[in-house]
């Protein structure tokens, strides 16, 4: 029979491992989505440089190439970019919570400044007005 102390340590290690696995999983997903976002950005840039707007372009979906209208392709990639941006932002906000839970389970203090958010355009403009005078 396992002693109560060993059982408690085992439960603690299982909890910490599960929390750490969730953090690593989210980080990996963010990296994968960011890679896809960069590929989309490259595709959009190539479409912007292409002067033949009236011609169809070849688009790769997985392992298959499809000929699509230039404008429709551009719109589709832009919508995908918006979706990826939202998904990455959602994962990053969840990641902050999961990291705090992991630190709490390990008995470590919460990271300072980890919950900061960047200023949006309106806040930045207001700050610039205040600083100018």
Curated annotation (Swiss-Prot):
Example GO BP: protein folding
UniProt key word Cytoplasm: yes
Short name of one Pfam family: Prefoldin_2
InterPro entries: PDRG1 (IPR030482), PFD_beta-like (IPR002777)
Subunit (UniProt): Component of the PAQosome complex which is responsible for the biogenesis of several protein complexes and which consists of R2TP complex members RUVBL1, RUVBL2, RPAP3 and PIH1D1, URI complex members PFDN2, PFDN6, PDRG1, UXT and URI1 as well as ASDURF, POLR2E and DNAAF10/WDR92.
Protein family according to the UniProt entry: Belongs to the prefoldin subunit beta family.
Protein name: p53 and DNA damage-regulated protein 1
Native species: Rattus norvegicus (Rat)
Encoding gene per record: Pdrg1
